[in-house]
């Protein structure tokens, strides 16, 4: 499909790819290539083609097509491509609150029972459709920050409706555990303290 209008306007817009820590990017990788990501942000990897090997201090994991992988902040993973492939990557420095029915206390109750281990999620059909829609925009060089923000909100709607609380607690544990424990502490005690 040919983009008919708008890209000329986007080229000089200050919101065209200005936020480098909160955005989707397409990453193509060759066989045996080492893959790295900034530790200053968290990253969700959507493997669309190929297979990668992830190593940490404890173990080695091999993951492939239709898997999502979360790399938390200050992660210490070594990643190597086992085959040629393509992934969609969402980098983020904060998480999005998109639904009033998803509150910190409910997620925290689920997370308190979790013993974390490296975990991936299978991309269910709505998540695959979502990833394809983001790739469509990236393939057509549409990098608008407003589109990026709307897609970042949309992904959490997909998580909300198509994954269980337990799946999400295991998957997002590396980035949510500290934030949610502090948030719950504040919400529980805010009436008892003079300042927060």
Stretches found by the model and what they are:
Residues 139-153, 172-173:
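All-alpha amphipathic helical-bundle segments outside canonical DNA-binding/catalytic cores
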Residues 123-135, 152, 169-195:
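A short, Lys/Arg-enriched amphipathic alpha-helix from helix-turn-helix/homeodomain DNA-binding modules
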Residues 32, 163-171:
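Short, Lys/Arg-enriched N-terminal segment that forms or immediately precedes the first helix
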Residues 159-166, 189:
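A short secondary-structure junction motif
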Residues 104-129:
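Aromatic/histidine-rich interaction motifs
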Residues 1-18, 137-143:
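A short, N-terminal "cap"/entry segment at the start of jelly-roll beta-barrel domains
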Residues 17-111:
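N-terminal regulatory/effector-sensing and dimerization cores
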Residues 6-11, 59-60, 119:
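Hydrophobic alpha-helices of bacterial signal-transduction systems
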């Amino acid at each position: 499909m040919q983009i008919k209008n708008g890209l000329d306007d986007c080229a000089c817009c200050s919101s065209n790819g200005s936020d480098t820590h909160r955005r989707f990017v397409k990453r193509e990788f060759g066989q045996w290539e080492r893959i790295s990501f900034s530790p200053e942000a968290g990253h969700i990897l959507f493997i669309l083609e190929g297979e990668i090997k992830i190593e940490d201090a404890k173990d080695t994991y091999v993951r492939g097509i239709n898997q999502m992988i979360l790399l938390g902040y200050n992660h210490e993973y070594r990643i190597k491509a086992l085959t040629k492939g393509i992934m969609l990557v969402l980098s983020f420095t904060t998480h999005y609150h998109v639904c009033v029915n998803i509150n910190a206390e409910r997620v925290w109750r689920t997370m308190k029972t979790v013993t974390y281990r490296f975990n991936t999620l299978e991309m269910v059909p709505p998540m695959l459709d979502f990833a394809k829609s983001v790739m469509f925009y990236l393939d057509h060089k549409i990098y608008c920050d407003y589109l990026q923000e709307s897609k970042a909100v949309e992904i959490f709607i997909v998580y909300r409706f198509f994954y269980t609380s337990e799946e999400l607690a295991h998957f997002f544990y590396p980035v949510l555990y500290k934030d949610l424990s502090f948030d719950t502490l504040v919400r529980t005690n805010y009436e008892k303290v003079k300042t927060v």
